[in-house]
Each structure stands twice: as C-alpha cells, then as structure tokens.
C-alpha cells in the first residue's frame, strides 16, 4: 500500500476544487447551525465550521438556542430560501427529542441526520472518501465497526458492505474481548480494519489491536483536561503508529483526523444543496 497523504493536505486539495467551482456562481452557499448550552466539544466544532466557511466564502449563521425554541429555529431555517444547509449540533438537551432531525427539510439536511435526508451522513462518508482517495482496497477485507449509531456506525457498516467488505458490528452490549476473539472470528487479528465509533474517550488501549490492523478512530469527546480525545488512548495511537511503516498499516486519529474529514463532507454537502437550488 502506498503511503497516505496527510489528511490536512487532502482537505486542502478538495477545498481548492470547491473554491474553483464556486467561481462559476455569483451567490454563495449558506449554512445554518443550531446548537445548545455550554458544551466545549460543540463550541469547538462550531468554531471549526465557521473557519471552514470563512475560508471558502460560504455564509454561516450559527445560533445558540434555548431548547424550547429549537423547533421554531429549524422551521425558520427551512423557510429561508437563502439558507441551503442546516445542521443541529449534538449533544441535544434532554428536553429536545431526536425527532427534531426529521423536521429538517431533507434537501437542507446536509449532515444526513434525518431519516429522509437526501445526503449521506458526513462522518462515515468523509472517512471512506479519504481512504478511497488514497487507493485503499476494501474488497475482501474483514471490517469491524464498533458502534451502531444511526449517523455513524450503521451507515458506515452499510458503506463497507457495499464496498464488498465482510462486516462485523459491535456495540455497547457486546463483550468486545470475547466477541473479537471468538471461534467465529478466529481471533481479533482476523479483522483487517477496525473503526471505533463509540462515545467513550480513551476506551481502547494497545492490547485491543494487532500491529497489522488498520485502525480508524472516529469517536471524539472532551476529557477532564478540557481537550479533545478519541476512542484510543494516546499510548494505543502511538503504538499503532510505530507499526505503520513496517506493516503498511493505517492508523487515523479522531483528533485532527476524522473530525476534519467530517467538516469537509459538510462543506461538500452544503455546496451540493446550494447547486440543487440554483
């Protein structure tokens, strides 16, 4: 396998293509974001999206709302012709039902969060597109997706099946140690590529992985130190990284990795929604 280009270089290439295509239009894509409370992870993500939009010349409207007003703001964005994309940033307050995602206009649901959205969820799409760009061969691989959320784990598993992988899905009720070493699986090492997509930071240490495996860390959260962390411990990430040159394996971090790929797909989906409106 050839060496992967750095994620930031890949993102720069894709952004340059978007900038070039945008020159054909007199107006600009407009993304609207709704978020809640004081959540450092949400605040960080919203700031990152604003930075991306500023770089590409998109309009960006981010509104921090009271939970009781969330539906009215979604309705307002839905009815505003100049708003092409809408996202509702998780986590949601307890008083806001998940059905709010289904209230987004499917043609504006650029995060792929609602059941009728015309767009694919950004996180799995971003990861798969990056791997494809680098010539990663999926066909025939044994893939394990750890996590079964509607916007990451499940759609990711479907994409991998469509790419002719043999897919195993684990989740919060799985006994990972037993599942990944069961007779059916032969051993944990029979998994060629593993995607961690759970809501627990630094959950996986190096003992979970084999040196030859490709590890894609998708989960993100704020640690006690106030910083973003992925599903892998720092030691596990470093441990796997040491083997990438020797075994031509791949390891991608959630921090500075899959999170950036998610934002890139959000930009692409917003541009698609914009073009559909022209």
Give residue spans per PLM region.
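Short beta-strand segments
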Residues: 35, 87-91, 146
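Rossmann-fold NAD(P)-binding glycine/threonine-rich loop
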Residues: 100-109, 216-277
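Anion-binding alpha/beta catalytic cores of soluble intermediary-metabolism enzymes, centered on
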Residues: 4-5, 12, 85-138, 202
């Amino acid at each position: 396998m050839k060496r992967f280009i750095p994620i930031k270089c890949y993102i720069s290439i894709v952004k340059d293509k978007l900038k070039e295509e945008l020159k054909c239009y007199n107006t600009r894509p407009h993304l609207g974001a709704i978020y809640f409370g004081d959540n450092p992870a949400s605040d960080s993500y919203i700031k990152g999206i604003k930075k991306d939009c500023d770089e590409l010349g998109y309009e960006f409207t981010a509104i921090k709302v009271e939970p009781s007003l969330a539906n009215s703001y979604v309705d307002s964005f839905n009815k505003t012709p100049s708003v092409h994309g809408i996202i509702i940033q998780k986590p949601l307050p307890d008083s806001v039902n998940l059905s709010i995602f289904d209230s987004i206009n499917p043609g504006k649901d650029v995060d792929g969060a609602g059941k009728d959205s015309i767009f694919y969820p950004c996180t799995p799409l971003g990861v798969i597109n990056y791997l494809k760009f680098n010539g990663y061969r999926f066909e025939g691989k044994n893939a394990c997706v750890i996590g079964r959320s509607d916007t990451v784990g499940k759609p990711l598993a479907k994409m991998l099946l469509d790419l002719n992988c043999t897919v195993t899905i684990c989740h919060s009720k799985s006994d990972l140690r037993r599942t990944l070493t069961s007779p059916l699986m032969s051993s944990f090492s029979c998994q060629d590529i593993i995607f961690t997509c759970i809501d627990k930071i630094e959950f996986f240490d190096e003992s979970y992985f084999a040196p030859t495996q490709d590890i894609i860390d998708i989960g993100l959260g704020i640690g006690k130190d106030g910083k973003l962390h992925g599903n892998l411990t720092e030691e596990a990430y470093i441990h796997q990284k040491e083997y990438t040159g020797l075994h031509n394996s791949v390891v991608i971090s959630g921090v500075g990795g899959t999170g950036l790929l998610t934002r890139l797909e959000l930009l692409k989906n917003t541009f698609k929604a914009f073009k559909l409106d022209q």
